[in-house]
Every structure is written in structure tokens, then in C-alpha cells.
Regions:
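Short, Lys/Arg-enriched N-terminal segments with co-localized hydrophobic residues
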Residues: 32-45
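Sec-dependent signal peptide recognition
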Residues: 47-53
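C-terminal motif of bacterial Sec signal peptides marking the signal peptidase cleavage site
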Residues: 60-62
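Bacterial signal peptide processing site
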Residues: 64-66
Length: 347
């Protein structure tokens, strides 16, 4: 039957089948069979489309729980931080405050990039300092007698009482450790374990910077050098190598430069109780050997230039020429750390 568009309308599959059956077997034509076949193909295609739509919907549904879970976790973390910060605002005990600050810092660092963690970590150090000071002040009587509690009357080390062990355990749980200051004095500081926990989550360039800072802490005690001359030279070399390994971080150069200059001066003139000369004013053999090694191992180093000139001096009884030599190189060298120092007014 012609349609309005001039095309022949296809009968439905059922109608086509009825027509085909109504004809004598000799008259059941190919056209009717073709129409029936086309409709069956059409139905099969529609079923396939519906199947694909169903599977797509199922896949989308399966993705939603993960997204929802992530959103829920983020909201829960934010809620926990808010709750902890409210508790912090009401806490007065420095130990409680330090514990809360650690929990807040841990939660904040979970949801940000390594670069953003640097700011969070440094903020923690700043705000934790006050509470560490508060704990030291509160426990001053105990800390003043810390070593006394661990020695007998003859000065021999003994096992501390269980109550003292429990007290030290509480310090450990807070992220604190006892640090010897010399001459029997001690104080509580943030523990190395705590630093390791946070530093491991930061970018490599910051981790290296941090280790340089820690390694140059307390390199002198009671006027004595706590490192060997070679260890001191190695620390200087590591500072200088940092600028080559991480050239794109001049902001770190600005942080390292002052300490680096102090190391150079220490390397050349020694300390009150770790001198570079013997009683007669002659350069100590171990110092001369170390300077020679450094100049050969790091020929392009500004420190190598200093020691090369220092080795030419005839006398070391007066340290002023050495100090002037160090100052001269520091004012003229193009090494990034010394350039950074001059930019800050260091020279």
C-alpha cells in the first residue's frame, strides 16, 4: 500500500506472516519473506541498543559509590579538622595543644600536594614551638634532674624507675625527645621520628634542604667542633652541590646561604677549643691534609679557592688574614649561595 511519501509501507511482522500463510504455498512470494526478515533484523538491532543503554547505566551507577565515598571522606576530614580546631582553641595544656596540632596537621597533609604540604609543615613547626616551650617550662624540675635520676651516687648509669619510663613514653607519643645540651643540661625538642614522618611526605628538594639544616645544627658544643675536619668539609660540599642538583629553587638558596658562610669560616679558623694550629702556631697536619683534599676534590668550589690561598700563608698564629681571605672570596664569588647572601645584605 503506497504511503503519503510515495514509499511502500512495510506490514508489521505479524501481518506479514499472516499474509504469507494466507497465500497458497505456490504463491508465498519472496517479497513477503523479505519484509518479515527485515523486521526481525530491526527488532534485533533495537534489542542491542537497549542492552547497551542498560549496561551504560549500570556502569555509571557503579562509579557513583566511589565518587560519593571520596566526597564523604573529604567532608568527614574537614569536619574532623573543624572539630579539632575548636578543641584547640579551648585547650590550655601545652601537651594537649601539641597533640591536637599534630592531628590537625596530619589531616591537612592528606588532602594536598607535596608542594602544599611544605607550607602546612612549616606552619606546624611555628605553632608547635610555643607548646614545646610550655612543656619544657612545666616540666623544668624534672628535666633539671633528668640525668640525676639515671645515675647512682657514684655517677654510674642506672635503669630509671618505671614511673620515669612512663613519663618518657608520654613524651615519645607527643613527638618529643630529650636532647643533651652539654654539661648535664637537657631539654625537650621535637623528635627525629616526628620529623621523618613529615619530611618523607615533602618534595625531594625540600627533603635535601632539611637534612642540610639538621646536619649543621649543634656542630659545635662547649666551644668544640663536634665533627671531624673531613665531615665539616663534606657538609660544605653538600651545600655547594645543592645549587647544581636543584638549580630551580633560589628561594632555598636564600635560606641556606648564611649557614653556608658560617661553615666556611669555621672550616678555615676553627673554634676556641678546636683550633687549626698547634701550640707553636703551626697548621695541624690533619687540617692541612683536609684542605688539600678539598681543593683537589672540588676544584671549582669557592671554598677550594679559599683553602688554596690559605695554604700559601707562612704563619697561622694570627687568624685575621684567614678571616679576611674568607670575606674576600665570599664578596666576589659567583656561587649561587654567595650571590644569594649578598642579595640579602650578608656581605
Amino acid at each position: 500500500m503506497p504511503s503519503r511519501l510515495g514509499h511502500t509501507q512495510r506490514p508489521s511482522p505479524i501481518v506479514a506472516l499472516s499474509l504469507w500463510l494466507s497465500f497458497p504455498s505456490s504463491c508465498r512470494g519472496i517479497e513477503v519473506l523479505t519484509s518479515l526478515s527485515d523486521h526481525l533484523v530491526h527488532i534485533h538491532a533495537m534489542r542491542r541498543i537497549l542492552y547497551l543503554l542498560f549496561m551504560g547505566t549500570a556502569l555509571l551507577s557503579s562509579c557513583r559509590p566511589s565518587s560519593t565515598k571520596q566526597t564523604t571522606e573529604t567532608e568527614a576530614s574537614t569536619s574532623n579538622i573543624d572539630s579539632l580546631e575548636r578543641a584547640l582553641s579551648q585547650a590550655s595544656d601545652p601537651a594537649v595543644r601539641l597533640s591536637l596540632k599534630r592531628q590537625i596537621t596530619d589531616l591537612k597533609m592528606q588532602a594536598v600536594t607535596p608542594e602544599e604540604r611544605i607550607r602546612i609543615f612549616e606552619d606546624f613547626l611555628t605553632i608547635a614551638e610555643e607548646d614545646v616551650y610550655g612543656i619544657n617550662k612545666r616540666d623544668q624540675d624534672y628535666l633539671d634532674r633528668y640525668n640525676e635520676y639515671r645515675m647512682d651516687e657514684e655517677g654510674n648509669r642506672i635503669e630509671p624507675h618505671d614511673s620515669l619510663k612512663r613519663r618518657d613514653q608520654r613524651y615519645t607519643e607527643l613527638g618529643l625527645e630529650v636532647e643533651e645540651l652539654g654539661e648535664g643540661a637537657v631539654e625537650l625538642v621535637l623528635s627525629q621520628a616526628l620529623f621523618t614522618h613529615y619530611i618523607s611526605q615533602l618534595p625531594p628538594y625540600y627533603q635535601t634542604y632539611w637534612h642540610l639544616l639538621k646536619d649543621r645544627e649543634y656542630i659545635t658544643t662547649d666551644g668544640c667542633l663536634t665533627l671531624t675536619w673531613h665531615e665539616l668539609g663534606d657538609l660544605i660540599a653538600r651545600h655547594e652541590a645543592y645549587t647544581k642538583t636543584y638549580p630551580d629553587h633560589p628561594e632555598i638558596f636564600a635560606r641556606l646561604c648564611d649557614g653556608y658562610q658560617d661553615l666556611q669560616l669555621l672550616y678555615l679558623v676553627g673554634t676556641d677549643n678546636t683550633e687549626i694550629t698547634d701550640d707553636k702556631g703551626a697548621l695541624l697536619p690533619e687540617v692541612r691534609k683536609e684542605w688539600q683534599f678539598y681543593a683537589e676534590a672540588h676544584p671549582e668550589s669557592p671554598t677550594a679557592k679559599i683553602v688554596q690561598e690559605a695554604l700559601k700563608l707562612k704563619s697561622y698564629t694570627n687568624l685575621r688574614p684567614l678571616r679576611e681571605l674568607v670575606s674576600k672570596i665570599q664578596k666576589t664569588s659567583d656561587h649561587p649561595l654567595l650571590v644569594a647572601a649578598r642579595a640579602q645584605g650578608g656581605n
